[in-house]
Amino acid sequence: MAAKKGAKTSTKKSDYYKVEGNTVERLKKVCPKCGAGVFMAEHLNRFACGKCGYMEYKKNEKTESEE
């Protein structure tokens, strides 16, 4: 029988916000389809939403400067 895996640790929502005085700033990009409260994962070359599957590719600075 295979060994049981440990429980996954969830992320704290407070890690996605920065509070300064009376203002709150989001540190991660928000999904435009799902709306506020659903953050997009940042990968090497893209942003992806885990809820709806929406994906945005990052602009490649290397190819733009060569043109």
Swiss-Prot record:
Give binding positions for Zn(2+): 31, 34, 49, 52
An example GO CC term for this entry is: ribonucleoprotein complex
Q: Write down how the cofactor binds this protein.
A: Binds 1 zinc ion per subunit.
Q: What's a GO biological-process term for it?
A: translation
Cofactor(s) the protein requires to work: Zn(2+)
Q: Does the keyword Plastid apply?
A: no
Single GO term (MF): zinc ion binding
User: Which keywords fit this entry according to its UniProt record?
Assistant: Metal-binding, Ribonucleoprotein, Ribosomal protein, Zinc, Zinc-finger
Q: Which stretches of the protein fold into C4-type zinc fingers, per the record?
A: 31-52
The highest taxon in the source lineage is Archaea
Q: Does the keyword Metal-binding apply?
A: yes
Under Pfam families, the record lists: Ribosomal_S27
- HAMAP family in the record, alphabetically? Ribosomal_eS31 (MF_00777)
Q: How does it assemble?
A: Part of the 30S ribosomal subunit.
Q: Which family would the database say this protein is a member of?
A: Belongs to the eukaryotic ribosomal protein eS31 family.
Query: By what name is this protein known?
Result: Small ribosomal subunit protein eS31
**Organism, as annotated:** Methanococcus maripaludis (strain DSM 14266 / JCM 13030 / NBRC 101832 / S2 / LL)
